[in-house]
A protein has these predicted regions:
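N-terminal targeting sequences that direct proteins away from the cytosol to non-cytosolic compartments
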Residues: 2-107, 116-140, 144-179
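Conserved hydrophobic/aromatic beta-strand scaffold that supports enzyme active sites
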Residues: 110-112
């Protein structure tokens, strides 16, 4: 009799767990957050804010502060390669300082770029204004392509912060999935 009761309790708990996953998905279990139609896992040392700017989904920064920022864009114009080329052209560098990687997964394609040099801060308001240059800067860029949508992640900051956050950046972009 006790064994049947224990078996019944275990079966009910298991069914409850399966129902929870069916209704809520696994994002909460794995610590993933959501914005619009994607989910992502945020590194412990980062803060995310939903952006009110056009095309931007998230603006991310370090909890500790520092000259480092990450932006997650959705469906901006251009292909993965065109956007990576645009990011590369925002830097004064030698081509030997650019590392690009392309990765094919079952449901998405991921392209990444890493580079270091002098950053020419884009001025979207006045393109004729003198360029603001920031030396000893780096960029980590990622493009995540799904069947019918594309997401861009761009991190810019001081070289040491970019290098220290490369692993977090890669974990973040690989965690992005459609809901």
């Amino acid at each position: 009799m006790v064994n049947r009761f224990i078996s019944l309790v275990v079966a009910l708990l298991f069914c409850g767990f399966i129902s929870f996953i069916a209704i809520n998905g696994t994002n909460e279990i794995y610590g993933k957050k959501e914005v619009q139609n994607i989910s992502y896992k945020l590194p412990d040392s980062w803060i995310a804010n939903v952006s009110d700017k056009q095309f931007r989904l998230l603006e991310l920064s370090l909890i500790e502060g520092g000259d480092f920022s990450v932006v997650l864009f959705a469906n901006i114009q251009g292909t993965a390669d065109q956007n990576i080329d645009r990011w590369v052209n925002q830097f004064q560098i030698e081509n030997s300082n650019i590392e690009t990687i392309k990765d094919t997964l079952s449901s998405k394609y991921i392209s990444t770029v890493e580079l270091y040099g002098t950053y020419e801060v884009p001025n979207m308001v006045n393109r004729n204004a003198p360029k603001e240059l920031r030396t000893e800067y780096g960029l980590l860029g990622g493009v995540i392509e799904f069947g019918n949508s594309i997401y861009f992640v761009k991190a810019v900051g001081k070289n040491d912060l970019i290098k220290a956050n490369k692993s977090n950046f890669n974990e973040f972009i690989y965690s992005i999935s459609l809901k």
